[in-house]
């Protein structure tokens, strides 16, 4: 008699695809408080699949013609319209670059932001911090 298994309760990304969990991070917010900005009372965590080869992080703007793949327009006022870029290299490694953002791009709680135009290699579990409170955690397949 064949063994039957129940389908997964949550849809999973296709094999080999990285995902990113986007969340409001109170600890990051408190360390980098921006005057006049309050932590959101109701912030929804979400997970997205990273479409290769590039994923732009920022805030949508029709007047500026920006439409990032990770759009934080409705959630984090500290995120620039063109904030950061995730790029899948030819050898299968994800990289992050700051695009000259106003408030910087930070990795794994480091005190110094990634310089504008500088690139760093990422691995599963790394956290990219942007804006006033957003933390993007990368998950390897």
Q: Which residue ranges define each predicted feature?
A:
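Intrinsically disordered, low-complexity acidic Ser/Thr-rich regulatory segments
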Residues: 1-77, 134-141
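Forkhead-associated
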Residues: 20, 45-132
